[in-house]
Amino acid sequence: MPLRLDVKRKLLARSDRVKCVDLHPVETWLLAALYNGNVHIWNYETQTLVKSFEVCDVPVRAAKFVPRKSWVVTGSDDMHIRVFNYNTLERVHQFEAHSDYLRSLVVHPTLPYVISSSDDMLVKMWDWDNKWAMKQSFEGHTHYVMQIAINPKDNNTFATASLDKTVKVWQFGSNVPNFTLEGHEKGVNCVDYYHGGEKPYIISGADDHLVKIWDYQNKTCVQTLDGHAQNVSSVCFHPELPLIITGSEDSTVRLWHANTYRLETTLNYGLERVWCIQAQKGANTIAIGYDEGSVTLKLGREEPAVSMDSSGKILWAKHSEIQQANLKTISTEESEAIQDGERLPLSVKDLGSSEIYPQTLAHSSNGRFVVACGDGEYIVYTAMALRNKDFGQGLEFVWAVDPNMFAVRESATNVKIKKNFKDHKSIRSDMVLEGISGGPLLALRSNNSLCFFDWESAVLVRRIEITSKSIYWSDNGEMVAICGDDSFYVLKYSAEAVANATEVTEDGIEDAFEVIGEQAEAVKTGFWIGDCFIFTTALNRINYYVGGEIVTIAHVDRPLYLLGYMAKESRVYAVDKDLNVISYKLLLSVLEYQTAVMRRDFDTADKVLTTIPKEQRTRVAHFLEKQGFKKQALAVSQDPDHKFDLSVALGDLKTAYDLALQSDSEEKWKALSNAATLKSELLLAGECLGRARDFGGLMLLATCAGSAPLLQKLADDSAAAESHNISFLSSLLLGDIDACLDKLISTGRLPEAAFLARTHAPSRVSSILELWKAKASGHSEKSSRKIGESLADPVKYENLFPGFTQSLKAESFVREISKIPVPASVRVPSAATRNIQEELDEAVASGAVSFTDDGQAVLKNAPRQTETQLKAPPPPSVARQPSPVRQPSPIREPSPIREPEPEEEEEQEEFDDDQQEVHVPANQESADAHGTSKTPDVVLETSRPDIVPPRGSAAPDLVSASSQQSAQDFQDDTQWSDEDFGDAENGDLNMDDLNLDEED
């Protein structure tokens, strides 16, 4: 029967004449040596030119990859061998290798050797580890040596093809050939070895239009392939498939069956003469070089023929050889030590050879039989001894749940059902079948519909209008996955509805299937474990589907094909195209728990949870989180990071705080501060911001709360952390100009310090100016111009700074009035709206202030802040206070003061008598009448608690020491409301109205 292979073109790259092609064993690269002297590297998956080398000005007839060295080796008509690094594109080495054109290059698979042949009739071997010294020369041909091929089964021997009409076989270390194969009537252009172990064959192609296959042990020609109309320029045994590939100057590439020598396919891409063919080991990819470009093809499918039964016995086919491996040979200790994705150390046993080339292997449900299907035939073997049980013609073979029943697709429209290896039923379809699938029902697939038939009666159960590629049934026969090109459907099968059906339409029984869900995933291979569907995707992921959710088991770097699941080991087993068996941990208890949760059977879920190991519970917690059960996920999760995220999402700030303390991560503290702010937990938010060293957030919190102690602490901490901008701004908000100047000086910002002092602290201008001059002079020592000398000191050059003396007095005046205590109930305008000089003039005129000989202001009869009050920095502006000094104009009168107790009344009157009458501006009444303000309240922080503790310390003392006056003005229990800040007016911040608790 013919070998049925799909041929898919991956790349067609037009170029100058291609004399040699090669395929990279790892990358998806095609190497093409051109007649114009260039070498191109194409990515045949993306169809893009990756790299290009300008080798020489004459034809490059040979080029090969050396992957272990990242090299490309070329041979050209200038008799030189050149070596390039294909990553850097640099030329590593070049030397003259022959005295005539180079025809062929091969790279030894294990040794550091490159072998070249030439028109000088010589074959030479070069050692790149020994500075490319010639290791050996082989002489014996009497004409051009066209090609070399190393024996893949014995790397010490190689064959050469020559225009002297012979093929010679050589051995390293000997200068004479082992033997010569003669039979072609004209020059031999190409030669290759058979890669399988069962046939000692060599293939050759010649100018006599013939292809000959030789037995190099018997030294005889076993077959001649006649079909080409011109010279045969290239031949190849495919290393994976039972194919012989030949190319000719008649523009065709012919595919022959390697066992029957039957011509399978002829390819012609219209690119003129064929010059070279290369097949990739371990894959189904071939490359072809033509006169007008190069082509890359993919033959058949790369999925290996492999099957595993329920006991862990694995059978696979390598070419026509059947081999067996058993998972039970791995000890318990070895199994526990195996990591996910690690190759299993299995011992392989040869069972024998199949009469056909198996493209698929499949065990029966009880594992007793295994079927090999391929070449249009099937053979049923016993799984233990590989004895032939049944055979026949068939394009496809599937098993029923009953191990004694199976179905064979004999043609595109006919399916035969056999029972006990005897004909049972036959189904003649009115549609063109693309495939069949087994299971509880027999499924027939066409390009636009899917039909399910009963095995016993061959009666249609249900027709579904859907395009499907594969069908997977659960073990209990209730669930089925119908997989298409880019999605799959999960259906529930009701055997009871089918048995009790009273009406059968032309589309079968309507209630036979119920759609459970659809998922946009391209399934490559899959199987069921209970109600969980395990599958691999086109994106090389291993996932499982349970209850409408997809969970990823692993991401892999290559395509994997699932074999099955072993409950005892709790592992999913898969194989790659090179037949390496790997596994991944997947606990059955986890699947049972997730299934129970999806069914909302929480009692069962709680029972199963106790059987799940702790190291697997975090995966369960992620599943619960996706399902919306965050509280349960928090209780189950073992990952501190995951628990922190869940506690923040749930608003459980206490748990989140404890977890953040354990890790002490800035990211966690920032996240917790955001959550605490949303919950109006400002104390906690402040502590978190402090631990996270988020000085910007602390400043926002301190200014919103009006906390002077917090601002002072923030200024100190940020300065220690060298966050100078925050420290400067904090001191500026506190009105501590001296601290601001010190920060500017310490950071070398002397010009800025001088200008700030000129505006706010004239008394410090001279000292800062001296520092500025010294720094400027130091920078200009090598210059003829002294920059520092151009800076004028206002003290020495008062004529250049009119009013400087008055500004000194104003500064002293402001420093004195800032010491007057300010009630929290008074609202005052900002400093920008005040005229300090005017206030000073009025105070001097009224005699409320006088100046000493050194210019220091002295206030008369003005109360002073106590020692406790002086610990807090002064406010940026002064509030109204009974004093002979003219106070800044308030926006409104203070809130009504609580009536004093009788025993305090006399003392209060005595205090009032000692004070002068307060000057109230005329515009105050109108402002009070409207009750509006353009500036925020300024609150003297006396009893406000420090919100943020020092970094790394224990929880803060939430109530700071208060003075006697503070105790009278505020209640002992501080509340975040307008009662602390005076009456609420338009523009006031009413924290009770924020309702932050509802924002989460």
Curated annotation (Swiss-Prot):
Disruption phenotype: Embryonic death and abnormal oocytes. It comes from the Eukaryota. SUPFAM superfamilies: WD40 repeat-like. Pfam families: B-prop_COPA_B_2nd, TPR_COPA_B, WD40. Residues 863-1000 are annotated as: Disordered. Keywords: Cytoplasm, Cytoplasmic vesicle, ER-Golgi transport, Golgi apparatus, Membrane, Protein transport, Repeat, Transport, WD repeat. The coatomer is a cytosolic protein complex that binds to dilysine motifs and reversibly associates with Golgi non-clathrin-coated vesicles, which further mediate biosynthetic protein transport from the ER, via the Golgi up to the trans Golgi network. Coatomer complex is required for budding from Golgi membranes, and is essential for the retrograde Golgi-to-ER transport of dilysine-tagged proteins. Belongs to the WD repeat COPB2 family. This is Probable coatomer subunit beta'. It comes from Caenorhabditis elegans.
